[in-house]
């Protein structure tokens, strides 16, 4: 109940309230003095409470201020998904999602290495973000209406367009997902995958038995041990986890794509500045690829005099777009120089020359037949 509501209810529940004097103060009131004192006290109490709340709100540090104070960005990532967020034996994190965290650090600090990583299960990720344990969630997370409107979170964009698929052992002899009636299916808890697979089997009049685990490695181990006939997750995830199987070549991804999975970074609601920083860090990487600006030529462009206006704005030679974010005007230059453009990140971590061998497909630029499109910096 709101403070103002309490005050109104208190007035309505107080005996001998003179409604004539309330609505017509120029007329003489017969309201007893002690009742008026009670109402005055309640009014003062509410005012003090509201004032205290306003002061507390005004003194609360923004995410950017908190990040600068501690000296790094705390980024929530997966517990190990090659190509997207995965740590090597030395503890170094790499991947498409990791590069987004590094881009934010480059924008804020001018140093892409000022990031610390929190490996999170699908079940843990939203709680970790809501509680303030992490500053940004960049963990192959699907943007859905419920997540966007009911959890107090904001999706800052899409850094990978995906769809859910299914992998089966070649020995099963299955060519299509429509042949999987009665199958045992392995997947992760706390994901859209569970809902999508239920919808697909129900729509196609088939039954199945779901075997769900919290950790991705548990799912892979169960499937590899033969506890399930099918492993289902995003198709990029299947490509990433396939390499962990005892005999990767003895498994095939079926042709059906049963859902839309727009994956992207997530932040808490209520801090538009931080939301903008994360969103425009991603936009800068996409715009850089479209404009032909990469980590190998951005430094040369910085000292070039006859730049196209769109390039000059992107790398901070024209306008004050960094200041609008609360950053230095070379924020995007730092991202491109230290992390690269979107295409560089894609090809380095998940492209055709990596173990995942993922073609760009819909993740190509809009000008090259894909749907990747960033708002302009101007």
Question: Language-model segments: which ranges?
Answer:
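Short helix-initiation/N-cap motifs at beta->coil->alpha
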Residues: 115-127, 210-225
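Sec/Tat signal peptide C-region and signal peptidase I cleavage site
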Residues: 34-35, 54-60
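Extracytoplasmic small-molecule ligand-binding "clamshell" domains
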Residues: 60-138, 321, 327, 342, ...
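Bacterial N-terminal signal peptides
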Residues: 43-53
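Acidic, polar ligand-binding/catalytic clefts
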Residues: 102, 106, 110, 114-179, ...
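Bilobed "Venus flytrap"/periplasmic-binding protein-like clamshell domains
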Residues: 74-83, 93-108, 142, 162-214, ...
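Short, Lys/Arg-enriched N-terminal segments with co-localized hydrophobic residues
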Residues: 9-35
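Extended ligand-binding regions for polar small-molecule ligands
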Residues: 99-102, 106-108, 171-174, 178, ...
